[in-house]
Amino acid sequence: MSETFEKKLSANPKTIAGYFHKLMQDWDEREVVELRFLGETRKPKNYRFETSQILKATNCVVEMNNRGLNAYAVVHPVLRQTPVSAKDADIKRAFFAYVDADEKGAADRVRESKLFIPEMEVITGTKPFLRNHIYFRFDEPMNDMLRWSGLQKCLIKKFGTDAAIHNPSRLMRIAGSVAYPSASKLKRHYRAEVTKLLIGGNYVE
């Protein structure tokens, strides 16, 4: 995280809550969402919340993000008794496949595809070019995480998206949080931006 972020930017609680509702809507009481807050030269901070604690999770994201930390969530559910931080072997089922279109032109390639109907889209930035995360919901949760990882690799190859996005405990940016670019990205004309959430073609804000 750069120390030169624009302090006037603030996380959007409605967008954050909308993201959590979509992410956690089919989880059971044994499962929690794991949040992680990261920044350059800053100690990582981890928190977990149950499906009944979306308001608390949202408030946590707003507080930590407004301190200048980037906000992420493990997309897949984490069992309550799992030690912090969750590892790939700790993830037992997946409700989504998703892609991280962080290279120039990748976001439009995914948007234009008719391969899947997106469940939601997180717009992670527009400067210096459009970047997004697009999520595709399964009809039934996938319990074979090796198969899930293989599917992720197929999506990466299909769309030319971030090649690292295939491990089950992968962190993804939380919609509605401010994305603070690193010092190196600032030099490449990235800017701090409030991330957006699109569901059914409509912004949640």
Language-model segment annotations:
Residues R42-K43, K127-P128, L186:
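Intrinsically disordered, low-complexity coil segments
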Residues M1, T15, E119-M120, Y190:
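N-terminal cationic amphipathic segment used for targeting or macromolecule association
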Residues H76-K114, F138-E205:
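DNA replication initiation modules
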Residues M1-F96, R170, V178, K196-I199:
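DNA replication initiation on ssDNA origins
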Residues D26-E29, N59-L69, E112-M120, I156-D162:
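Structural alpha-beta junctions
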Residues V84-A86, P118-G125:
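N-terminal accessory/precursor segments of enzymes
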Residues R36-L38, D100-D102, T124-T126, G176:
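Short loop/turn segments at strand-loop or loop-helix junctions that form parts
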Residues E121-H133, M172:
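Short, conserved phosphate-binding/catalytic loop or strand-edge motifs used
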